[in-house]
Amino acid sequence: MELKEVREGLARILVPKAERIYDAPVFYNPLMALNRDISVLALKALGSRRVLDALSATGIRGIRYALETPAGEIWLNDINPNAFRLIVDNVKLNFSGELEIEGKMAVLEGEKTLVVTNADANRLMNEQFRYFDFVDLDPFGSPMEFLDSALRAVKRRGVLAITATDTGVLCGAYRNACLRKYLAEPIRGELCHEAGLRILIGTLVRYAAKYDLGVEVLLAYYRDHYFRAFLQLRNGAKTADKSMKQLGYLYQDESGKFEFENTFLPSKATAHGPLWLGPLKNQEFVEELHRLSAEHPLGSKKTQKFLGLLKDELEVPFFYDTHAVARRHGLEVRKLAGVIEILYEKGYKATRTHFSPTALKTDAPFEEVLEALRELQ
């Protein structure tokens, strides 16, 4: 395996040389640097001590956790023997001290404890029952096959950080797969990315509720080809019930107008969901991440700006894409800033959204958004 060295944050990492990232014997995606940046900032803000990077590949995420956060014990796991050997090499590259290797486990004891394992992620998480403060799942595709085990491995007041890259499934391109994996009806069109993210969270909430665990969404977002969510678990049946009450369904008609309802069973056959209708962020948490991003070494130049957009985004479910609304009603497309300004003048709140550069989140009714577009003609 031919290797090259890359730098990200404070880490130096050996990665395979390959023309296409998917052809490499061990997976490494430089485009996920922003994802890893936000994860490092989140772990730094939380101060979690015991961390599991369950699907570690090159080890870049777990090594950045060890170098850049207060975490004291970091486990890096991958079932691929090539990945295990590469993680060991990368740990040696970034940390002094003797790495003790025995079979499919390597341990480095020092100021930080690093544990590298070559194991099936589900088996490892089931064996380490309620051991970790922070469990990170960053799979290729859907995280659902790992979720039950992750909920066993994390402490009952711990944090799950979960990535899903099966956006085609969650966004309705593969409806049957969404029904199978997430037990939810997806939606196509301009709302698919936010609905897909909320379907993912809604499924996680239902899984957690089986173990009498409630969920607080610290931050959830869509970016490029993936969804990402940081979920703080809350212990107790009542907190699980409270989280379940924030599930519901989305409806959208041909005009582009949408509505949603908090209910266990939908009132109409045209429902999309069940999905999460609660907040996608804890405002104080996101503000802290944005503050930390100004002083922390980052792997992506886009991280701080993206966190600023998330920080300023209005916390309401779903949005109106001005291009889609204009197209449906035979109107000319106008600048988003103009629509936002008109809504503000009428006393409504309105902001840009990270889900689309041509969309806005607002507490204004659909008719007011449509009227604002007409005023700009």
From Swiss-Prot:
Gene3D superfamilies: N2,N2-dimethylguanosine tRNA methyltransferase, C-terminal domain (3.30.56.70), Vaccinia Virus protein VP39 (3.40.50.150). The lineage of its organism: Archaea, Methanobacteriati, Methanobacteriota, Thermococci, Thermococcales. It comes from the Archaea. Residues 4-373 form the Trm1 methyltransferase domain. The keyword GTP-binding does not apply. This is tRNA (guanine(26)-N(2))-dimethyltransferase. One of its GO terms (molecular function) is tRNA binding. It comes from Thermococcus onnurineus (strain NA1). The gene is trm1. One of its GO terms (biological process) is tRNA N2-guanine methylation.
